[in-house]
């Protein structure tokens, strides 16, 4: 069957479908291949949708009281007032969700750069995890070190130090790179007021919070303060926490850890968290306790 015969057959089928009320011209089915207009290519960069402040981003078309709605939104990063198109999210809302989700995935699967570690003069050690996949599927290996790594830890930290500050990548490398450089100086400055010095700082790759117990067991440190990237969400991929424990060792209950959480630019600022951590460390040294025992 040639092209002309095929075209006539299609026309007949169309006429039958519309009841014969439409006169379909053969010229209307002429192929338009090769007649498309040229595509316009712009060299301009698209704006980064993640830079929009979600607290002031208002997409409702007909709000009864926009001012009060914005006042409520200013108190929370929750996705309020995002509007809808029929039963669906608006395009901008969906793009923002996908962008925030992508940022969260990047934070989990990317590594803290070697340049960042060298710049801050951290001493690099690694847990028993071989790679990121094993780290995510075997949390137990993220709490232990090999013999060679333990020797590096002992050599760096010494025996029975009063305070150790350690950094672990955890589940968000972005959180470490965004907050550590501001928080550590704040902790050191606060501790210096109490005449407390700290040894060189360890950086732990593939770290779980329990890695501080292995370090405490090896060094017999009085207080260990661990800065670790927390599991990212759609609000932020840069949230870090500080886990502080007195006499951390194998088998220590989670209730003995004191936690400063939600450390990021939209929560507790790194400088503020650092000052608070220094005060907590001094209090732990004085009371020889941490976690819920510190409140007793």
From Swiss-Prot:
Compartments, as annotated in UniProt: Bacterial microcompartment
Organism, scientific name: Lachnoclostridium phytofermentans (strain ATCC 700394 / DSM 18823 / ISDg)
Classification of source organism: Bacteria, Bacillati, Bacillota, Clostridia, Lachnospirales
Function: Catalyzes the deamination of various vicinal amino-alcohols to oxo compounds. Allows this organism to utilize ethanolamine as the sole source of nitrogen and carbon in the presence of external vitamin B12.
InterPro entries cross-referenced by the UniProt entry: EutC, EutC_C, EutC_N
HAMAP family: EutC (MF_00601)
GO MF annotation terms: cobalamin binding; ethanolamine ammonia-lyase activity
Pathway: Amine and polyamine degradation; ethanolamine degradation
Cofactor requirement: adenosylcob(III)alamin
Record's catalysed reaction(s): ethanolamine = acetaldehyde + NH4(+)
Binding site for adenosylcob(III)alamin: 209, 230
Any Pfam family hit: EutC
Name of this protein: Ethanolamine ammonia-lyase small subunit
Signal peptide from the UniProt entry: none
Family per record: Belongs to the EutC family.
UniProtKB keywords: Bacterial microcompartment, Cobalamin, Cobalt, Lyase
